[in-house]
Amino acid sequence: MRAKVRILDVFSGRYSVFINEEEAKKAKLHPDDLVKVESGKKTIYGSLAISNLVGPGEVGVSRDVLQLHSLSEGEVVTLTPVGTPESVRYIKKKMHGEKLRKVEIEAIVRDIVDRKLRDIEISSFVTALEINGLDMDEIAALTIAMAETGDMLDIDRKPIMDVHSIGGVPGNKTNILVVPIVAAAGLTIPKTSSRAITSAAGTADVVEVFTNVSFSLDEIKRIVEKVGACLVWGGALNLAPADDITIKAERALSVDPRGLMLASIMSKKYAMGSQYVLIDIPTGKGVKVETMDEARALARDFIELGKRLGQYVEVAITYGGQPIGHTVGPALEAREALSALMTGKGPGSLIEKALGLAGILLEMGGVAPAGMGKKMAREILESGKAYEKMKEIIEEQGGDPNIKPEDIQIGDKTYTFTAPTSGYVTGIDNRAITGIARAAGAPEDKGAGLELYVKVGEKVKEGDPLFTIHAESEARLDQAIVFARRTEPIKIEGMVLQRIGNI
């Protein structure tokens, strides 16, 4: 059928094409049918939605569609039904536990990106991977397919380094120190980061407090060619676009298939042209990987996958049992990171982890002898060279290079929790800390979060401050206080844990 485009000011949460009931009956089309919309050289696939939002002779497209395709109001298009893609048969193969060939994986990924697969079919694929898994041949094929169906970055400055943390630890602003340290040593490190999904602040959320993070691939190339590094938001780029689509299914199903997680991370490193990749796997209670055995197994998979992609990969298993540094939340973390860069000093957990990771990268990149990377990283940080490099990065990304920590606004609605008894801090609940910061408004409210005054093993007296919640509104502060009282994120115990009488 031929019809005129009507742009609907809605986000359906799906890749939908709308027609009204009368047109659907005439064309014998049904809800969720896969349809193709063509106009000249433009071809768009989507799931059919039947709605009275459009009239006869109209095809409605949602804002979701317009984010990826340019269509004009009133543009004449042709809408036709499309048969079931061959890739659906390959998904069924994996549902039955069979191994997929490279060409089959490529077909699935291509159809995900082209929107030929509907939400239910993508969810079936993700479920099949969760239940039946992928072997390393399949993971490598999936990784390359995910990268090559999106944009690829080609940077002349070599070698290209990269670092990625699989996350789970509150307050992890480590890479804001690592990147300028590595770049100050003459290595190239184009760092793309995510925004928070379930955490209180992703690296991109923190960096955005003091400079821009959304750039095109050409702009990133210009920045990196000039200063040797960047700290940008990966979501503004068309890197491994299938990943963004499958993540929605993973969230809806509350699953995280191991093979898909490996491909998700490494496809973006492959697309960025990274030659040397350091993976940070935080381990401990309350993070994604809780045991050393799990961490070692995952490390082996990353290293093997890197070999198949032509990348040299090393893994750092790091302590993740409590927050990094003393702050959680975008603006608070930005203050702490900038202060550490300016002074060369800061919380031990932040400084030591940043220097440890940067040191490994310096050794991987061949600018520091084996075993001397951390020492070199410390010299770069304490000499101010890392701070000067960070100022260059901030300026090239459109921020004020002379910004000071105190210039950054934090939430002025505060409440401080104190120790209910004297004793020792025996545990800090990562998930509870994250939950409190999010209840306070982070990451959307940049000034929201919390400041920690104690760490595990420290002695406290009754009435000593434990942490302060920051919020931008009284309502958010009240929510965070209620959440904190319910979860009791900091555990304090005396030396006598329990008294048992004579029975």
UniProtKB/Swiss-Prot annotation:
One term of GO molecular function: AMP binding
Family membership: Belongs to the thymidine/pyrimidine-nucleoside phosphorylase family. Type 2 subfamily.
Binding annotation for AMP: 168, 194-199, 203, 264, 288
Annotated Gene Ontology cellular component terms: cytosol
Catalytic activity: AMP + phosphate = alpha-D-ribose 1,5-bisphosphate + adenine; CMP + phosphate = cytosine + alpha-D-ribose 1,5-bisphosphate; UMP + phosphate = alpha-D-ribose 1,5-bisphosphate + uracil
EC number annotated for this UniProt entry: 2.4.2.57
Keywords: Glycosyltransferase, Transferase
Classification via Gene3D superfamilies: 1.20.970.50, 2.40.40.20, Nucleoside phosphorylase/phosphoribosyltransferase catalytic domain, Pyrimidine nucleoside phosphorylase-like, C-terminal domain
Membrane-spanning parts: none
Record protein name field: AMP phosphorylase
PANTHER family for the chain: THYMIDINE PHOSPHORYLASE (PTHR10515:SF0)
GO BP, one annotated term: pyrimidine deoxyribonucleoside metabolic process
PROSITE patterns: THYMID_PHOSPHORYLASE
Known function: Catalyzes the conversion of AMP and phosphate to adenine and ribose 1,5-bisphosphate (R15P). Exhibits phosphorylase activity toward CMP and UMP in addition to AMP. Functions in an archaeal AMP degradation pathway, together with R15P isomerase and RubisCO.
Catalytic machinery residues: 256 (proton donor)
InterPro entries: AMP_phosphorylase, Glycosyl_Trfase_fam3, Glycosyl_Trfase_fam3_N_dom, Glycosyl_Trfase_fam3_N_dom_sf, Nuc_phospho_transferase, PYNP-like_C_sf, PYNP_C, Pyrmidine_PPase_CS
